[in-house]
Regions:
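Mature extracellular/luminal domains of secreted and GPI-anchored eukaryotic proteins, especially small
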Residues: 19-145
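Cleavable N-terminal signal peptides of Sec/SRP-targeted secreted and luminal proteins
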Residues: 3-22
């Protein structure tokens, strides 16, 4: 996973649900990013048992509350190095990425601030709650791989 750029890792962090129109992806999520992320996506699907159908449901705005989906979201964070030594989400890369995209900056900062406060539970529950919250507050910047 070391070959991934910070931009890729950041987009993957953001990529835990829907875009503006359900089922579409943000313009900055390229086909190349999706291709590079595929090995991690496949590994996390295998590890957690989440189905492609469940992932697609989230992309379409249907939030299923199954444990496999919740743990899949945390697995993505973990595999892309977005979890610190306390096994908590590290948002520095995400914030740095969006500093270069002024159209999204304030929206992203607000969503992160609000969602970090309300997310809780174990790692899987935290990832799911944060992702769902973020998707609701910044749908333009979010997509689930």
């Amino acid at each position: 996973m070391k070959h991934l750029t910070m931009e890729m890792v950041t987009v993957i962090l953001l990529s835990a649900t829907i875009a503006v129109d359900a089922g579409t992806r943000p313009s900055f999520v390229s086909d190349d990013m999706i291709a590079k992320a595929s090995s991690v996506v496949n590994a996390c699907q295998t590890q957690t048992g989440v189905t492609t159908t469940d992932i697609e449901a989230v992309r379409n705005g249907q939030w299923l509350e199954g444990r496999p989906l919740m743990c899949y979201m945390y697995c993505l964070w973990e595999q892309f190095g977005l979890v610190d030594d306390k096994r908590e989400l590290s948002l520095n890369g995400m914030l740095t990425f969006f500093q270069r995209m002024p159209a999204y900056r304030a929206e992203v900062q607000r969503a992160i601030r609000e969602c970090k406060r309300i997310a809780g539970g174990d790692n899987c529950q935290y990832a799911y709650t944060f992702n769902k919250c973020y998707a609701e507050r910044s749908p333009r910047t979010y997509y689930l791989f």
